[in-house]
C-alpha cells in the first residue's frame, strides 16, 4: 500500500527500559514476528528510529 509502512517486531522487548516497551505498545506490536501496517508519517518513523534494535521495516 502506498503511504504505509510495515513494521515487524523481531526481538522481544523483555529486559528493555519501560520507555522502549511503551514505544512497542504504541506501535500496536505484542508478539515477536508480528507485522503491523502503519501510516508512513514522521510520528511512526520516529518511533521506529527509537528502537531499531527491536524492529525491522519490512518492504
From Swiss-Prot:
Q: Which GO terms describe its biological process?
A: translation
Superkingdom of the source species: Bacteria
Family matches, as InterPro entries? Ribo_uL30_ferredoxin-like_sf (IPR036919), Ribosomal_uL30_bac-type (IPR005996), Ribosomal_uL30_ferredoxin-like (IPR016082)
Signal peptide positions are none
Give the matching SUPFAM superfamilies: Ribosomal protein L30p/L7e
Example GO CC term: the record gives: cytosolic large ribosomal subunit
The UniProt keyword set, sorted, is:
Ribonucleoprotein, Ribosomal protein
Subunit field text:
Part of the 50S ribosomal subunit.
By its UniProt entry, which PANTHER family does this protein fall under?
A: LARGE RIBOSOMAL SUBUNIT PROTEIN UL30M (PTHR15892:SF2), MITOCHONDRIAL RIBOSOMAL PROTEIN L30 (PTHR15892)
| Similarity remark | Belongs to the universal ribosomal protein uL30 family.
This chain belongs to which protein, by name? Large ribosomal subunit protein uL30
- Naturally occurring in which organism (per UniProt): Solibacter usitatus (strain Ellin6076)
Amino acid at each position: 500500500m502506498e503511504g504505509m509502512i510495515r513494521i515487524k517486531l523481531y526481538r522481544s522487548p523483555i529486559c528493555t527500559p519501560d520507555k522502549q516497551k511503551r514505544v512497542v505498545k504504541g506501535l500496536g506490536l505484542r508478539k515477536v514476528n508480528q507485522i503491523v501496517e502503519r501510516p508512513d508519517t514522521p510520528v511512526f518513523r520516529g518511533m521506529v528510529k527509537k528502537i531499531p534494535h527491536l524492529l525491522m521495516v519490512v518492504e
